[in-house]
């Protein structure tokens, strides 16, 4: 099986796109951008060349890092580098924000990433600042919880969990019973959502670099986590070790772990001869569960969007977009793949910064 991607639209935003959420009817997309939260009316899938312009719904006081739809697409949650969580009511017809129902500072540092449970009733945000905690520059443990689980309806905190900072990614499993997160140092933790108990905790050294050139500190780590469709294994993504962390030339990398085993076992990883160089920042599963996407920045190689078989881990599809990809999402029917990110930051022209945030839409087919 091979997966083919046919580009069916590119939509620009004033600034870089950090995350996206797509309505179940595939008619509207919401974007978390460096300068705010945007809504984009999506043209029909057949209208490949039709232009669409986003509208700003609101702003945080810093970069917006995460966005997700709640309660039948009638509310929108967003998180930011200012450490805040906001929930906005949406107009069912226009998709515009009616009011901000909730706003709270949930972290004293950045919200790196946010995830919403499959039933859309729970929000999890992860945080943490990298401060040297010892002579070997290992991170200083955080003085506050770095993982927070919040009830999306009652807006109350359900769990406050501790993990070595910075915690850079988070994901629920398909049942909503388990929560996983990854950090700079390659630590991975799986929790029970109901109790907050740690079910598995381990470290992989494959994603973290120590700078011996220019940057004498730890860098990179795990940037995306995702459970398999049966919840039995956990995938982690980022890039391989580098001697010069400023070069960004680590191997494009994912690893798969049987997290229920004692001890946890690495059971699979991306194949070296099928990957290039660059930081991988997002994972997304096709609704069928037959394959997943890993995407991010390209430093060297043939693709920055790779599609991999769930069964054998083989590369079965690819795309080279020319932009850094920060978020990937499939439509509910699996026929469309959305890729979001940014492409450089141009110099101002005539007193105005040209757009440098983008969402690309691809039609998905099998051959």
Question: Where are these predicted regions, by residue range?
Answer:
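WD40-repeat beta-propeller superdomains and closely related acidic/aromatic-rich repeat-like regions
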Residues: 1-367
């Amino acid at each position: 099986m091979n997966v083919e991607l046919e580009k069916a639209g590119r939509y620009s935003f004033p600034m870089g796109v950090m995350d996206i959420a797509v309505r179940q009817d595939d008619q509207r997309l919401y974007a978390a951008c460096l300068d705010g939260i945007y809504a984009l009316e999506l043209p029909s899938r057949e209208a490949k060349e039709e232009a669409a312009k986003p509208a700003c719904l609101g702003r945080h006081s810093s970069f917006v890092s995460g966005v997700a739809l709640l309660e039948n697409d009638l509310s929108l949650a967003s998180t930011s580098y200012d450490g805040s969580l906001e929930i906005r009511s949406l107009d069912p017809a226009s998709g515009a924000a009616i009011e901000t129902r909730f706003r709270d500072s949930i972290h004293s540092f950045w919200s790196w990433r946010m995830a919403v449970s499959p039933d859309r009733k729970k929000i999890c945000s992860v945080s943490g600042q990298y401060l040297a905690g010892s002579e070997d520059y290992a991170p200083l443990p955080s003085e506050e919880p770095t993982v927070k689980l919040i009830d999306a309806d009652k807006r109350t905190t359900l769990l406050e969990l501790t993990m070595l900072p910075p915690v850079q990614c988070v994901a629920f499993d398909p049942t909503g019973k388990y929560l996983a997160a990854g950090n700079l140092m390659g630590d991975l933790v799986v929790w029970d959502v109901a109790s907050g108990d740690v079910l598995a905790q381990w470290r992989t050294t494959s994603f973290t670099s120590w700078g011996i050139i220019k940057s004498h500190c730890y860098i990179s780590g795990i940037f995306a986590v995702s459970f398999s469709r049966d919840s039995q294994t956990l995938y982690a993504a980022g890039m391989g070790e580098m001697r010069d962390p400023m070069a960004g030339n680590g191997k494009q990398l994912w690893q798969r772990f049987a997290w229920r085993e004692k001890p946890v076992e690495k059971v699979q990883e991306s194949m070296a001869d099928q990957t290039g160089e660059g930081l991988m920042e997002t994972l997304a599963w096709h609704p069928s569960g037959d394959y997943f996407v890993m995407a991010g920045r390209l430093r060297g190689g043939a693709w920055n969007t790779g599609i991999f078989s769930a069964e054998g881990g083989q590369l079965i599809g690819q795309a080279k977009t020319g932009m850094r990809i920060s978020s990937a999402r499939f439509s509910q029917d699996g026929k469309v793949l959305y890729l979001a990110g940014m492409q450089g930051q141009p110099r101002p022209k005539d007193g105005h910064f040209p757009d440098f945030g983008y969402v690309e839409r691809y039609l998905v087919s099998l051959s």
